[in-house]
Amino acid sequence: MKNFTKKIRSKSIIVLLSLLSVFFVLSVTFTMSKYVIEKQVGNITLNLTSVDTLIPGLQLRNTLGTSVTEVVFGKTEDYESEIAGIEPINVDVQKKGKIKLYAKGTKAYILSDRKIYANPDCWHTFYELTELTSVDFSNFDTGMVTNMRGMFRGCTKLTEVKNISSWDTKNVEDMEFLFRDCPSLVSLDLSGWNTAKVKILYGTFYNCVGLTSLDVSGWNTASVKNIGDTFYGCSGLTSLDVSNWNIDKATQMHYIFYNCSSLTSLDVSKWNTAGVADMSGTFFGCSSLTSLNVSSWDTAGVTDMSHMFRNCGSLTSLDVSSWDTSDVANMNNMFLGCGSLTSLDVSSWDTGKVSNMRNLFRDCNKLTAIDVSSWSTESATDMFCMFYGCGNLTALDLSGWNTGNVTDMSHIFLGCGRLVSVYVGSGWNTDNVSSSGKMFEQCKKLKGGKGTSYDSAHTDKAYARIDGGTENPGYFTDIADKP
């Protein structure tokens, strides 16, 4: 009987221990699952006690103060001598003193006994800390971060960002203005970043003029909707590989390469631009590019092409002949300053919706001919300086143009010193033109169809008509009389 009782007790103990083990495993599993789930979701209202999480970015920035020059994220044990006697400030989101900030002069130590987890919201963490020169992220986990917008924006003296290459960015969705206006940065190793969830790259490297190279060739951009201004003003970049970027979801790419004036080559030939609406300023100021393959770009949805190739002064050729421009409303300054182009085929472009043609071909002074005869211009209101400085054009056929809605034609042909003939048809109308000053200035070889020669006293719209001889002089020739 006693042996039986002992056996029962032994079995009960074993069962009890087994149940306790199961409970322990389930409890740990639940806690870890909760941690993993909240880490993946990026829950900003963290209530985790299992990790040491920083306060949100802007709050930390305000705690650091604007005079800080160096910031170190580290383990407490590694900096005990440096922080001895300094009263710390709690900067953990739980407010339990798990992460402490020690200010020593202008240097800040942000320390914990364990790993420091960045808050999911890192917005403006170091925003406009204009004295900041160095940040060391030795003990800094970004695995929960979803928002990095403006994190280093305006850190004009920042020269060193340590241990950033290994950041876990798999949950980040917003990198807008991440390094904007960090002109002192000369190198950044971001090649290993996981950008699969990033939706916004707007202005990420805006005005990082000190960068000479940047490896983003392996970035996954499949989720990105806005790549506008991404490399805006990166005038020091001599090479940039974005050839394999997937921009299928992008709708905005305005000024993405603005003033990347040191780039001599750029491969964007495989980009799918079908969803892009705004291409304004895309290559504005890429003055060292000698060639550019955009011939297969899908432009059917584009509404704005203003400043697109402005000041691409080294481009000798450009194939945009098959572009669909039927939705474009703005071509302001599109080819301004493309002074090395010797030919440009835009003959089949549908310009029916274009209202702004201001400076469109200005200073394309190596073009000897340009066929815009079939362009539809009924929506155009502004033709200011459209052919200004096209000094090698000898003839222009504008016979298909309807200019009844144009209000500004001032300087339209100014500086076209070799222009002899301008052919127009019945659609040419200047009744609504209110600004026409210097329309034909310096067009000394221009001659109307009935023999009217250039007269420096008549350079406004008064002679912008088909030549009717001495009784009705004009500088144009009826298309019916074209040889």
Predicted stretch roles:
Residues 31-483:
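Negatively charged
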Residues 1-43:
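Gram-positive cell-envelope targeting signals
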